[in-house]
């Protein structure tokens, strides 16, 4: 069965082998429009919510439009066919070529925006793609693929450049990963591990657990609004949604008060009750996230846990615990539940940030609301995360937004920290092979002095100092030596 998909994908790709940059760009725009226009996006968002029971329709519409338009913005005028770069000084020319057939695995939490964005991204390099949807979101993902194929049809491109496994299973997905040229795994840890174990070159993503420091000098109202919006958006389906905030004690009351005013409820006496509902014992005897809470509304989660909140509540707040490594609320929660810590000095806040991220979600992302460049520098130079957002909503900013310079994507590499091959936002550049053409030029060999000169002079100076110090010690000791 998978072999048939592969054959059709290769035939389609071969049929566009002659396409110029302008022609493939036209294809990307046509495909993009079909998963961007208001009529189709509403259908996709509605299908995703109805099929998966996750998120909400208005936010999915907004997410879809932002992601697709953001990707197309980045692709506009970008070179992905033929000569893409030339260095006249080094006499180097770089030529882009397709990687081939890509097997793209998609998550249940984002079953339409992910294939839409990744489909366009993969097409940019004249590749073909076969999507393996999550079984619980197969109809929504197929709808997105059908819309994209309609875009291909309208510009006369082969429809089988984009395909989907209509009845997905672990076995079929495993076979797909073995037969394609490259795998893109956007989803949970087991999926990513399977991709890396397939024997096929693969790009994977790491688990999220985004944490923000709310510094004493920040714009409190702005920071609170951005955190609240990010955490409540689409019921926190995004892996970039803030899971914890670390608030300076001097602004703690104002910040939390603003979160409550915006529509948050601080769970205090019921904290243990909420924890026991959110993390249940699995088949292996370990406590893990309750699937019933993933991307559900704060009201639904609270009601199910037996906690009374009003209809207006969009985010549940819990106080952070000192035993971070043992506390479940320190982890990724995949729900509109936010853990709140407090700190006095920056180093204390930084250590909490580090512990939270090292405990879960290493390599993914963190952020800070501040205007203090020293704070920003410390986090940027020291944290083991691939992204640091400054004065931004994490869910919107990590994957690229119109208010920052991050590359637009729905797939976030987390580097070796997160068990991934790249720490970059995954874009079209990851789906082209590049041939380097090198021409001969007159040799420019550096002298030994240029490379080693400073070092050898330092060694010589150090040696001279060491000899003088040793001689001084000998002179000091000599009066006390016995004469035989």
From Swiss-Prot:
It comes from the Bacteria. The active site is at 239 (nucleophile). Keywords: Carbohydrate metabolism, NAD, Oxidoreductase. Its EC number is 1.2.1.-. InterPro entries: Ald_DH/histidinol_DH, Ald_DH_C, Ald_DH_N, Aldehyde_DH_dom. Part of a variant of the sulfo-TK pathway, a D-sulfoquinovose degradation pathway that produces sulfoacetate. Catalyzes the oxidation of sulfoacetaldehyde (SA) to sulfoacetyl-coenzyme A (sulfoacetyl-CoA). Is highly specific for NAD(+), with only residual (1%) activity with NADP(+). Cannot use acetaldehyde. This is Sulfoacetaldehyde dehydrogenase. It comes from Acholeplasma sp. The gene is sqwD.
